[in-house]
Structures are given as structure tokens and as C-alpha cells.
Amino acid sequence: MIRRGDVYLADLSPVQGSEQGGVRPVVIIQNDTGNKYSPTVIVAAITGRINKAKIPTHVEIEKKKYKLDKDSVILLEQIRTLDKKRLKEKLTYLSDDKMKEVDNALMISLGLNAVAHQKN
């Protein structure tokens, strides 16, 4: 079963403009109920270009810890819904601590922490 925090190789083509494309790693960010019942899955793209600008929506992941080809960055500003058929091979699973970083970056990307601050 596909689980939140899994890292898969996925085919993101075709793309337009600045979208991440090709066959590349993605992290599953959809909840596990959706992962179980939906034919689609919500993912964030991962890039091996760690020289990309360090912005609050980026989460670094280490190649040794996660058995990747190179140190990488999860791009939480590059989220999209994919048909599960685009997922090719499971590569690894992110730790709970790393997923907390993903959640924080995702909240920033979606503007959810601004909403939380307005309610307090």
C-alpha cells in the first residue's frame, strides 16, 4: 500500500514552464485514507539540485540516510495530483521527524500558518 511519507520514482511528464518533469523521486503527502481509496495521489517533487534557493518550502534529505543517488531537496511549492499509475518504484520512506519538516514547509506553501495565526 502507498503510504504518506513514501518516496517513489514517478513519471511527471508532460510538463509546462517551470514544473518539475521527467522520471524523478516524489514524496507522498496525501493522507493514508486517500492513498487507500483514491485512484490518485498527492505528491511533492524532489530535485537533486541542492543549489536551488533555500526557501521555507524546501526540505533537504540526505542520500545516505534515505538511500538516494544524491543529496536532494523536497520542493513543497511543487505539489501535484498524479494517477497512481505514474508511480514506478518505491525508493524509501521518510522518518517522522523529516515528515514534520515536510508538514511545516507544506503549511507555509499553502498559507495555512497565516490562517492559524489569524484565528489565535
From Swiss-Prot:
It is an enzyme of class 3 (hydrolase). Its EC number is 3.1.-.-. One of its GO terms (biological process) is rRNA catabolic process. Thermostable at 90 degrees Celsius. GO terms for molecular function: DNA binding; RNA binding; RNA endonuclease activity. Keywords: Endonuclease, Hydrolase, Nuclease, RNA-binding, Toxin-antitoxin system. It comes from the Bacteria. Homodimer. Forms a complex with MazE which inhibits the endoribonuclease activity of MazF. Belongs to the PemK/MazF family. Toxic component of a type II toxin-antitoxin (TA) system, cannot be expressed in E.coli in the absence of cognate antitoxin MazE. Ribosome-independent, sequence-specific endoribonuclease that cleaves mRNA, thus inhibiting protein synthesis and inducing bacterial stasis; it cuts between the first and nucleotides of 5'-UACAU-3' in single-stranded RNA. Its endoribnuclease activity is neutralized by coexpression with cognate antitoxin MazE. PANTHER family: ENDORIBONUCLEASE MAZF, ENDORIBONUCLEASE MAZF-RELATED. This is Endoribonuclease MazF. It comes from Staphylococcus aureus (strain N315). The gene is mazF.
